[in-house]
């Protein structure tokens, strides 16, 4: 026997002193701390199919989907693994068998750690896949074989590496599908026909399988919970509403009904009951189904008189302006501890703060319950066509073939500094490989304080910005976010971000002092200007959105344009404050060239002149 052969034989001898060690931590205990949705979810999703069938594409899309819904997972890709763990293996039958065995063992460890492990390997031979299944089953771990099925000609047409062409030319030997067989699975858990289905459809087929097997909660598949009465039940519910006692609600309350009914506050089914209210007040989250970010209370205040009148009723109608809007069911009344609420949400109880003033003047009781909303809330102000629901926004993005959606929340007119940030974000997304990034320009449309520019004027100004080409109309959606404004700084900015996440945004631009305002008495910033961005980067439950920090933009006097501020060239920049901008507009003067699109500036001056006339 040669020395090399002898050494190889000796290395293959198994040690007799190796004993498998049992973990001290159980899978259930591990599942409690892995991810933000409690429960052990460890399993392996084994994607098999020809090269070019779509395994890697589906694997990474499934990974992105699960992570965005707080399900911990990891994708093992065939090419990636051969760069490291299996770099010493070739493509002989023996090496292929060992490649799959190693992957199965690694996948088992990932699954045992509580992750959904997604593997994307050709794995052409049935016996190797069966061995991978046995490795998992012997460890008591679920294993799901997914056949990614695409005709050979389709796979060849997708072959960006040119491997099929080289195999047909004889340059690559033993290539699966050409001169090496692929043994199709006989009884896979799912078959994905990638020539007939979209990537999204394939992902949802796998998610449905994981739900059926109790790996993924059913609650995550329906991302948006609308509270409208189904059309086939509407007549019956309307008739019922006519027989019920009613509670008159304010315009502010109606705005919150709109927010709830359209699904912006998913998974809330109505105004918060005390349990939900306490979770939000003390943890900034809802905790009944994992950790769901919810930083602001969405509550319905009522007077002591209305509480006395209605507390014996399990259900009653909410009415506004004499119109029955919704039925509130399984009502629960609890004390409205206003000072505590304001302290926790705003960090102050100063009644000169405009929203705190409204809270302090509202009812002494809160009522929570499930809502059945009779119809979509419309304001008939000429702007309803911009009030797109989360589902409508998702559909709009789908029609635009968006592969990234970046949201910009605003309650002020758009100047070229804002536009620079949005343009720069789009540029960065394109550099990262996205093909069709879409901007969601999403002005807040609910209640705002008296000195803010009203919604109708802001919408005219935004339209002028698009008309002048400062932002690209073809890749921009302008829609109205129906929420009232709280001016609650870092607490509120989480709500702004999370609601856009619900609507499909996966990038969120956060600015300086988001949702902030000057302290009503000291006139200094009520919140530290950088805290909003810092809090968003740490906030729990915002797993499917990436925070894009707001770079400081100012007017560059040399360039005569808005530019990103460089402290080394401080003297070149002019910081044009909102106060100065409003003063110029009131006096009919123009700002420096390049500060704002001329047509957009004219809208602003027209608004302030209208105030002077009135």
UniProtKB/Swiss-Prot annotation:
Binding site for adenosine 5'-phosphosulfate: 79-82, 91, 96-99, 122-123, 161, 174-175
Keywords for the protein's UniProt record, in alphabetical order: ATP-binding, Disease variant, Dwarfism, Kinase, Multifunctional enzyme, Nucleotide-binding, Nucleotidyltransferase, Transferase
EC code(s) of this entry: 2.7.7.4, 2.7.1.25
Residues covered by region (Adenylyl-sulfate kinase): 1-215
UniProt catalytic activity: sulfate + ATP + H(+) = adenosine 5'-phosphosulfate + diphosphate; adenosine 5'-phosphosulfate + ATP = 3'-phosphoadenylyl sulfate + ADP + H(+)
GO molecular-function terms, A-Z: adenylylsulfate kinase activity; ATP binding; nucleotidyltransferase activity; sulfate adenylyltransferase (ATP) activity
Top-level EC class as recorded in UniProt: transferase
Coiled-coil spans in chain: none
Protein's GO biological process: 3'-phosphoadenosine 5'-phosphosulfate biosynthetic process; hormone metabolic process; sulfate assimilation
Associated pathway: Sulfur metabolism; sulfate assimilation
Segments traversing the membrane: none
Superkingdom, natural source: Eukaryota
GO cellular component, one term: nucleus
Residue numbers spanned by region Sulfate adenylyltransferase: 224-614
Residues bound to ATP 2: 409-412, 511-515, 553
Tissue: Expressed in cartilage and adrenal gland.
Residues that bind ATP 1: 52-57, 197
Result after altering residue 76 to Q: In BCYM4; reduced 3'-phosphoadenosine 5'-phosphosulfate biosynthetic process
Effect of residue 10 to K: Decreased sulfate assimilation
Associated clinical condition: Brachyolmia type 4 with mild epiphyseal and metaphyseal changes: A form of brachyolmia, a clinically and genetically heterogeneous skeletal dysplasia primarily affecting the spine and characterized by a short trunk, short stature, and platyspondyly. BCYM4 is an autosomal recessive form with mild epiphyseal and metaphyseal changes. Clinical features include short stature evidenced at birth, short and bowed lower limbs, mild brachydactyly, kyphoscoliosis, abnormal gait, enlarged knee joints.
Protein role: Bifunctional enzyme with both ATP sulfurylase and APS kinase activity, which mediates two steps in the sulfate activation pathway. The first step is the transfer of a sulfate group to ATP to yield adenosine 5'-phosphosulfate (APS), and the second step is the transfer of a phosphate group from ATP to APS yielding 3'-phosphoadenylylsulfate/PAPS, the activated sulfate donor used by sulfotransferases. In mammals, PAPS is the sole source of sulfate while APS appears to only be an intermediate in the sulfate-activation pathway.
HAMAP family on file: Adenylyl_sulf_kinase
Family classification: In the N-terminal section; belongs to the APS kinase family. In the C-terminal section; belongs to the sulfate adenylyltransferase family.
Protein name as it appears in the record: Bifunctional 3'-phosphoadenosine 5'-phosphosulfate synthase 2
